């Protein structure tokens, strides 16, 4: 699963998921899956969506993952009293804002791309829309 090889600090503040999204256009492929809401996307969810898309297109096209989980989420063990420091890192997430392109696909027909993105969207905790590359 995706996670950084090295970070400056092991743990991070909780923070808030506000602001506008970067990466709102399809750049690498011809089709994209765009988020229509805010969420925390975990490494497991990204991997699950990637596998669903790969199986659907039968490894004939190319998939680009435009998100990377670089924020550590900590958790204390069950039935542990408050205090005694911050918990251990349990999983990694990426904060998603509306309009962010999550995945891109190329070298496949539009019907196959739509079907693959539909399967991937079922694995994600946020509403998504299908977008195509606009040529200027």
From Swiss-Prot:
GO biological processes: translation
InterPro entries associated with the record: Ribosomal_uL16 (IPR047873), Ribosomal_uL16_bact-type (IPR000114), Ribosomal_uL16_CS (IPR020798), Ribosomal_uL16_dom (IPR016180), Ribosomal_uL16_sf (IPR036920)
A GO CC term assigned to this protein in UniProt: cytosolic large ribosomal subunit
Keyword RNA-binding on entry: yes
Sorted UniProt keywords: Ribonucleoprotein, Ribosomal protein, RNA-binding, rRNA-binding, tRNA-binding
Gene Ontology terms, MF aspect: rRNA binding; structural constituent of ribosome; tRNA binding
Signal peptide range: none
CDD domains, per database record: Ribosomal_L16_L10e
Alphabetized PANTHER family for the sequence: 50S/60S RIBOSOMAL PROTEIN L16, LARGE RIBOSOMAL SUBUNIT PROTEIN UL16M
Protein's job: Binds 23S rRNA and is also seen to make contacts with the A and possibly P site tRNAs.
Family of the protein in this entry: Belongs to the universal ribosomal protein uL16 family.
Subunit structure: Part of the 50S ribosomal subunit.
Listed name of the protein: Large ribosomal subunit protein uL16
Organism: Hamiltonella defensa subsp. Acyrthosiphon pisum (strain 5AT)
């Amino acid at each position: 699963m995706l996670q950084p090889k090295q970070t400056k600090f092991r743990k991070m503040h909780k923070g808030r998921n506000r602001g506008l999204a970067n990466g709102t256009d399809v750049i690498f492929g011809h089709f994209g899956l765009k988020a229509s809401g805010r969420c925390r996307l975990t490494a497991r969810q990204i991997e699950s969506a990637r596998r669903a898309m790969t199986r659907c297109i039968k490894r004939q096209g190319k998939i680009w993952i435009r998100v990377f989980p670089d924020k550590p989420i900590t958790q204390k063990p069950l039935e542990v009293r408050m205090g005694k420091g911050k918990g251990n890192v349990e999983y990694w997430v990426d904060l998603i804002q509306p309009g962010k392109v999550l995945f891109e696909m190329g070298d496949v027909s539009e019907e196959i791309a739509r079907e693959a993105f539909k399967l991937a969207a079922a694995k994600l905790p946020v509403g998504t829309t299908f977008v195509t590359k606009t040529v200027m």
